[in-house]
Amino acid sequence: MKLRVFLACVSFLVPFVSSSATTLRVEPYTIPAADLGPENPLPMFRGDKEDDVPKLDPAIPEAERRYLGWRTAWRCLPHRMQDGYSRDKKPRTFDSLVLENECLRATFLPQFGGRLMSLIQKPSGRELLSRNPVFQPANLALRNAWFCGGIEWNTTLRGHHFLTCSPVFAAEVRGTEGEPVLRLYEWDRVRCFPWQIDFHLPPGSPFLFARMRIVNPHARELPMYWWTTIAVPERKDVRTLAPATTALSFNRDTGVSLVPLPIWNGRDQTYTTQSLSAYDFFSRFADGQRRWIAALDGEGRGLFEASTDRLRGRKLWGWGMGQGGRRWQEFLSLPSEAYIEIQAGLAQTQSESIPMPARATWCWTEAFGALEADPKLVHGKDWSSAWKATDEAIERILPRARVEQLDAKFAAVTTRAPARSLKLGSGWAALERRRCAAQGLPDPIPAELPFPRESLGADQKPWLALLEKNELPKHNPGEEPGALMTQPEWQSLLEKAKSNHWLTWWHLGNLRMEALDFDGAEKAWQASLKCQPTGWTLRNLAVLAERRGDKAKACDLMRQAWQAGPQVAPLAVECLQALTRAERYAEAYDFVAALPKAVRAHERVELLWAKAAIETGKLDGVERVFKREFATIREGEVSLTDLWFAFQEKRLAAIEKVPVDDKLRERVRHDFPPPRLIDFRMYVTGGK
């Protein structure tokens, strides 16, 4: 039996004629999982700039500088932040979609952005990915919540995707030979375009293929972004290879540098365990070079990813071997589950978007599978021989021409309507189709991407009423104000609406603020207050005041917002943040003391209270903060270790009756290293 399966898997290069061996089914998937919790009801407005241009090494050629930083500045709206999770895990069952043939078993979770959780090579029983044994959100994504493991699909904007912890649509499509193909798809709410991924696992294929399609439905250019993020196990003997001799590497202090491969800073950076700090590098390919990346162990075995030429970028990411990097690894999973990321993207780096022409459609195909190459060459000192041996091994099992042929063949499936629906995503695409139909506009979404009426839910209900009745329903300000909107077409609908109540003006102000029309936002929010004073509107005015540089006014408005209510934890956190930025520490300390017990227990309230306590010299009770495991520490955030050092400085200064000066600070950092529990410093090594 094993011999028959092996022969079926190795004979894939011969065109297949039967579809009987590929199956697609829904299966329960049970793992220890934290509750994702409620979304944050407060809108998080983007900054004033659309570009985020890093420092650039003068050695980087002009052609590679052109789009670095272009349209990469953070934004989240109309999505709300997903920051309500904890670290309490219990067994939970999710619906998974399993695509399987004789050679591979691929398991997807449509509830979490369509994440490919597992890819098992059946003849050997090997898991080809880093499969996270738990679901533990952490603060790394554009909307905060993110979890590690498997393969993630990221579009729209630099960072982990808006839907990485949200449902997407899933459907079964018939393949070129009648075999089942899994389609994942959604509507992007930030830049307003549809995207889809068709997963092909032909009978006898030892490779999983993903054919992506992005459609720009607009008569204008779109900044476009795509990166496929693949987690693979990290071990000392694992080497990441790509066909390049130089790379671009990002550093928080020096920006983007052009570096040699594989050795720089005295270490071979293709082995992630040789680096103490977190790092990445983006390979620079020669013209005409096939695009691929692989992570191979000491025996020359591992996973590779290859694609058609549109997907031009490849990246390696490692957490580093410092205490903070190791802490992050176990924080995201379990102590024994260290991983690295190999990635593939549309641009050369992740710090850039690229212009997508009006009305354009972009497609490409990626392949994922097991690879074996000569370990002596793969791990030899000659880097050129190492990557060329890997390149040749990939070409033997999956020729570049074959992938191009399959991409052309799969194109017919890309535009094919599904045979059956498997899972529903959000109702926003269905709402957009209704808006376009009501306004006599062309459908911006290909017909073969169904977004049925039943996907419309509570989030879309008030906006549907605005569209159909020219009126946004009234809403109790004691409850959360509901889903947000930033699409310009809805701004004009709100401006013409019959409804004249606080929520209509509040939403209109949100739209204007996100469009950087600060005066227009203020007018709308003042109109909202005239209709009915609410904490939601006062908070937004506080955000605007701080944006304009008036910290005192921002603090006062935040306090008014808290008094007006509803007194929810996210508002308390923002009020404390405003007081802290204004250095009104005594006021912040007293504010916490008056909070309801449930709000006082919020981890961010606790963290800000500790800051205020240290600054005001009230050190009693602060030490308990350093024994708490915080759930929402941000990637790159060092607030906990900063608090630790500040606490030790104040404590020693009081005991020894000395000032807190540079000499004391240096001593504290040498004599009082932070506990592992709170050390998330990714760029600190050797205690420095």
Q: Can you say where each PLM-predicted feature lies in the sequence?
A:
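A contiguous, surface-exposed recognition patch within enzymatic or periplasmic domains that forms
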Residues: 27-69, 97-100, 107, 111, ...
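Extended, loop-rich substrate-binding clefts of extracytoplasmic carbohydrate-active enzymes
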Residues: 59-102, 148-207, 323-351
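Alpha-solenoid helical repeat scaffolds
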Residues: 503-507, 536-540, 570-575, 603-609, ...
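Short Pro-Gly-centered flexible turn/kink motifs
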Residues: 97-102, 106-108, 171-173, 212, ...
